[in-house]
Swiss-Prot record:
Species of the source: Saccharomyces cerevisiae (strain ATCC 204508 / S288c) (Baker's yeast)
Protein known as: Enolase-related protein 3
Keyword Metal-binding part of the UniProt annotation: yes
Membership in a protein family: Belongs to the enolase family.
Positions with a binding annotation for substrate: 160, 169, 296, 321, 373-376, 397
Length: 437
């Protein structure tokens, strides 16, 4: 079944910034998708096309991307008469229309909105759920489906919050739950106890939340954050069942080959900046003291040698985000140089569903794990919930149990788990190997 109408408009993300919504119409009805955006974006990501007109939306308008859907992509798709179930053909057509290596002409935000819409329309055409359709596209097993472990970002720092804390995300993972529903309850309880502790230790404003829903107290160090998180876990009685993850996002504090954990201070003393080896020692001290099972972006996006040296010394999950940017060329290099053991997959880093699926399978083929991720500028669109189940990734991060744009994904996973019943399993302690379960 071919597409009869394509329409894009400007809507707003969770930070109040403009973003692109796309609608596609077929004989089966109308289908929508909204594109998210990041704050700590990697320089190697596909280009999110912004207007740059400082007199409107502070330069963050997306009218160019919207126009590219309405005047270029839409007419070309309708003229092509490609069936909506030809995901690869449609995505390749848009890539060809763009004609650049990073989607800078039409914008990854324009192309992705159409790509996700097409998948929804195709699932409806085939009369199956979106996650089942994605599983078919990826040639992934469906017997049983795997429901992911949620990595809740319960405490925000770095570019996602105020305060002086350098590292961006402190996450909890209910690996000891028996189901996603139980994981949600456990996460909710820990999160609310953490809020209470934050207010007690840092005052009422410490309960305020960052971009991704986590509390954002004016904490100085990672140890302060981890102490409070572990205390909240223990209060709930979940010691050993709820583990911890960190996303350092250090590209924002990488300076002259060193890492400035005091980067939010304008007059930070360079003599206190850490060398890659010193930062590794710091990570090892945290790993010894806290129940950390996952480190994301321990080093900057082009500090390749530090990544590979560090991986040799640890036995926890090391996630590549800014290093790889869901880009097949960079993923291949990271695999070759043994820089990480897990890929963070963000749809808008690469810009089409087809390329995202290819990136996931590339990682799986190398024995890596894959974590599906939201962005800090999110929307109510729950597409990644279907994506993580369809790809059997076993793990997802979509922020804290706060803010509706975060809960939209988690609530959709609750529905999927309930719908599948005995035809699904919760990844639990084997979150890294979801595709092998």
């Amino acid at each position: 079944m071919s597409i009869t109408k394509v329409h894009a408009r400007t809507v707003y993300d969770s930070r109040g910034n403009p973003t692109v919504e796309v609608e596609i119409t077929t004989e089966n009805g109308l289908f929508r998708a909204i594109v998210p955006s990041g704050a700590s974006t990697g320089i190697h990501e596909a280009v999110e096309l912004r207007d740059g007109n400082k007199s409107e939306w502070m330069g963050k308008g997306v009218t160019k991307a919207v126009s590219n859907v309405n005047s270029i992509i839409g007419p070309a798709l309708i003229k092509s008469d490609l069936c909506v179930t030809n995901q690869k053909g449609i995505d390749e057509l848009m890539i060809s229309l763009d004609g650049t290596s990073n989607k800078s002409r039409l914008g990854a935000n324009a192309i992705l909105g159409v790509s996700l819409c097409v998948a929804r329309a195709a699932a409806a055409q085939k009369g199956i759920t979106l996650y089942k359709y994605i599983a078919e596209l990826a040639d992934a097993r469906q017997d049983p489906f795997v429901i992911p472990v949620p990595f809740f970002n319960v405490l925000n720092g770095g570019a996602h919050a105020g305060g002086s804390l350098a590292m961006q995300e402190f996450k909890i993972a209910p690996v000891g739950a028996q189901s996603f529903a139980e994981a949600m309850r456990m996460g909710s309880e820990v999160y609310h106890h953490l809020k209470i502790l934050a207010k007690e230790q840092y005052g009422p404003s410490a309960g305020n939340v960052g971009d991704e829903g986590g509390v954002a107290p004016d904490i100085d160090t990672a140890e302060d954050a981890l102490d409070m998180i572990v205390k909240a876990i223990n209060i709930c009685g979940y010691e050993g069942r709820v583990k911890v993850g960190i996303d350092s996002a250090p590209s924002v504090f990488y300076k002259d080959g060193k890492y400035d954990l005091n980067f939010k201070e304008p007059n930070s003393d360079p003599s206190h900046w850490l060398s890659p080896a010193q930062l590794a020692e710091y990570y090892h001290s945290l790993l010894k003291k806290y129940p950390i099972i996952s480190l994301e972006d321990p080093y900057a996006e082009d500090d390749w040698s530090s990544w590979s040296a560090f991986l040799k010394t640890v036995n926890v999950q090391i996630i590549a985000d800014d290093l790889t940017c869901t880009n097949k060329t960079r993923i291949a290099r990271a695999i070759e140089e043994k820089c990480a053991n897990t890929l963070l997959l963000k749809l808008n880093q690469i810009g089409t569903l087809t390329e995202s699926i290819e990136a996931a399978n590339q990682a799986f083929d190398a024995g890596w794990g894959v974590m599906i991720s939201h962005r800090s500028g999110e929307t109510e669109d729950p597409f990644i919930a279907d994506l993580v189940v369809g790809l059997r990734c076993g793990q997802i991060k979509s922020g804290a149990l706060s803010r509706s744009e975060r809960l939209a994904k988690y609530n959709e996973l609750l529905r999927i788990e309930e719908e599948l019943g005995d035809d699904c399993i919760y990844a639990g302690h084997r979150f890294h190997d979801g595709n092998k379960l």
